[in-house]
Amino acid sequence: MLKRKSKKRWLLALSAIGLLAFSTAIIAASCKNEQKDIKEVIPPNNPNNESTNQTKPSDSTDKKDNTTTKPIEPGQTVDPNALVDTPPPAEIKPVMDALEVSVAQYNNANTPAAQLSINDLKNNLDQIKLTLKGNQLSLFTARVSELRPDYNDAQQNISSKTGHAVLVVQIIHNKSKTYITKEIEISGFKTSPVLVDENGFIIQEENAAQKQQQLDYFTKYNADQRAAFDNKEYMVGLKNQWNNALLKDVRPDLSTVSNNHKNHFDELSKSLGLDTYDNQAYKGYTLPIYNADQSVNGLSIAKKLPPQGPSWVDAYNRDRFKNKGLARLLLNQQYQTMGEQTFSVLFTNKNPNYKAGNENDSKIATDDKSKFPLSVHRGTMWILDYVQPEDNSYPTKWYFATNLHVADLLNETTEGVSLTRLNQKPPLNTPFSLTEYDDHFTQFIIGSSNDHDKTQRISEIFKVVYKATDFLNKDPVDYLADQYKDEYKDKKEFADFAVIEVDFSKVKNNEWSFVSNNKAVFNGLNNDQQKLIQTLTNDYANQKDKQIKFINYDYLSNFENHSAPLLKPDFEKYTGDQFYLLGYPLAIEDFYFSQYDTEKVQGLYRHSTSLWTNAKYEFFKQPSVDEVGVSEETKAKNQKEMQQGGRFSYQIGYRSFLNKPGISDAFLASPYNGNKFMKTHDNKEFISFGLQYMPRDYEPYGGASGSSMRNQRNEVIGLYHTKTQNTSTGLVLALRSSGFDYKGLYGSYNLPQYDLIYGTGKDQKTSYRQALEELYKNQNNVHTNLFPNGFSKEKVDSKFLFKNS
């Protein structure tokens, strides 16, 4: 499952979003001449009919066409690829030049111009019907090849305001396939008082000076200047989302904070690279309330969160509605490795809302939860660790990492678990189909066929051995203002991370099922336990060079070394970390299927998954490096770009560290998990804590929760846990944080220091290592791949120790 932030549309786009380039649609409108063939006129200087075009003599019937007006209907086949880009024959060109062309109707419904916008025409040029007037009309075909909108001095399309544009028409000589172009001015179309794009989104109108400012942003601005530019425009849009309400109405919990308090806060926050008090308040951040003596009484958590908008930088010169990642395609070996180690997990649970008999009651809605005895939930998890057998046989006890809100679905009601992963050595640059309907994926299903022991068997095989709940030395309530302590006294902190143990040795032969492309596979594999587990894990234990590692730093304290430059030439020289994410969302928002594919998979989206990565959407239709006809230069360019990973998003709403794009403090900027506090199946609520990252181009649908974020060395950075709708990014929990001292800005609260794998932070009390230490405290001979020397802190590699812990 995937927690979401607000779905509310960010209609008032930021000014820089308005700087997105608009591509002009060029759609051929082929026309068919319904009249009988009319022979070309043979010029007087060619009496022997020796035309260079081998034309026949004209007859008297030709005269009938000479002064008529002829409608050109869609349907006449003219292959645009067959046109000849040379001047028409000399004897024909004067006739073509004399032709007059006009618009007969703008679409198939013959809608008047006043009821259409220029944007309505842009994607439907093939519906425009033309009329030709002149001589020898049967010799020619006309079609609209281009629509040229009006532009302002910043090169923005402003036809939505002017209602005016120019149609570029090709008049084609049918015999020679040569053509001339003419232009038709069109006007009187529906107008808008503001600029809107073809999707109906409002965009900020700019001028040449603003364009220059954007150029300066990329080429001259430092991090602080970029943050100031982005934040100023973002706040305009954000306040519009609040209907320009006063701060006292947006955040009544902060009504006692004076201007003196704010001024003091702003002075210190600026020195720390943080936003002003008022801006943080509008963004829904956790903020201090003060005592009469100016000291901080404690913090106040916002009751209502605003919607978030995208970053214009992330979407610059791209389709911002597609900046969600790349579906069903592996571009490079790093994604391939992650695909071999990452699983789509599905839990089948008893439905607590089910009422026997409701499934047959026609009066109850078909999608009512009470009709279904079982419920299914999906997430993403990946191989974390395994217990090393003493006899050096292939491991049977494995540990998988995922989000807490995914692992929480594994509980006393779970009757079955399905693990789906890519088969070993999956192909690169080859589009897959839906995960459940593709031979490159295999589904391993575990569950008892006996109704009386289904949940018991699952609980014996699967266990959640670590949850990052109440993992810090202090509770959230310790930082809150006095007036909120009682309200939040029972809410502990959490990081969205958990570890699931799977003991495959406990699975009985008849509790296995194997499916690939909706067909049973691996007949008899359940009789060979070692081979089965080796197959399921893609031989992970024997591939030491592919096994995961963990970074021993964080990007807040090492931002300068890992801040990818914006300009392409600079990025090609960049040696810092690049980011790779891979998960399995439901295919509901997989927009990459073609019309033919859609027909094949129609009806399967809601119950199937698509492999998803944070690669650029543009690569889906890039020519393959092996494709015939592609130049060597293009092949080399594509190959180089496809090896690259992603970078941090410039989304500024969640970015609590203003001059460090992609870096955020969860407790301050997003204490909720979605729009509410995280609630586990036992009804306990938790407040989000820890360091968070925001990767660009990763906004998959539900099911991708638990996706790992790694660098180019296959070192794990964190786990993706929250989709932030329409922002081209999401929230990733950092598994390691060096902490950050706010110098008293938020009272006693500072970003905590922790390492959720190795447990070496000064502010934490639990970790995966400590969970294993407790689990095996009476078994000194147990070792795992990550902890080959034991589980005590003294055995941890020194590179994971903090200098000031």
What feature does the model see in each segment?
Residues M1-N46, L167-V169:
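Gram-positive Sec-dependent secretion signals
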Residues K3, K8, C31, Q35-I38, ...:
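Short, intrinsically disordered low-complexity segments
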Residues K8, N53, S60-D62, N119, ...:
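Serine/proline-rich low-complexity intrinsically disordered segments, especially terminal tails, linkers
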Residues A13-S15, T24-I27, N53-D59, D490:
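Generic secretory/membrane-interface signal
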Residues K36-N81:
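Ser/Thr/Gly/Pro-rich low-complexity, disordered linker/stalk segments of secreted
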Residues P71-S805:
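Terminal presequence/propeptide segments associated with secretion/organelle targeting
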